């Protein structure tokens, strides 16, 4: 029997716990989402209240939508059809200029010349049918 099982990041979802919790027991997975901050807990509760689950995929989608929302507000998009080209360019430039933003579990940094996002992470472990945070490097 293995002493340590490390799982694929995208497996840290509610579906795994619903479908094969016993088989996943003890599995350790690095992930970019767990409800460890007030805002992450709020988003997880909203997802549950609406029949969903918050995981690294849906949390990333939430973060992306909120980033776009903040940029739209910051550049002053009006929605006026006469300004569509200028406003599209302003949003594009606003997104490109972002170097850091607040994510659900901490600050997200962007490597400008690569376009790669550096996100905080935690390690979760499958324990009794739930994902339990076992390492939080904050």
Q: What are the functions of these language-model segments?
A:
Residues 1-138:
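Extracytosolic ligand-binding ectodomains
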């Amino acid at each position: 029997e293995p002493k340590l099982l490390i799982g694929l990041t995208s497996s840290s979802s509610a579906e795994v716990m619903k479908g094969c919790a016993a088989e996943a027991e003890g599995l350790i997975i690095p992930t970019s989402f767990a409800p460890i901050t007030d805002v992450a807990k709020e988003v997880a509760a909203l997802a549950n209240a609406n029949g969903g689950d918050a995981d690294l995929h849906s949390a990333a989608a939430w973060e992306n939508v909120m980033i776009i929302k903040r940029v739209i507000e910051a550049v002053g998009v009006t929605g006026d059809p006469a300004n569509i080209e200028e406003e599209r360019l302003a949003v594009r430039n606003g997104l490109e200029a972002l170097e850091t933003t607040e994510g659900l579990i901490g600050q997200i940094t962007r490597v400008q010349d690569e376009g790669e996002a550096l996100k905080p992470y935690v390690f979760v472990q499958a324990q009794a049918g739930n994902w339990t945070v076992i390492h939080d490097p904050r």
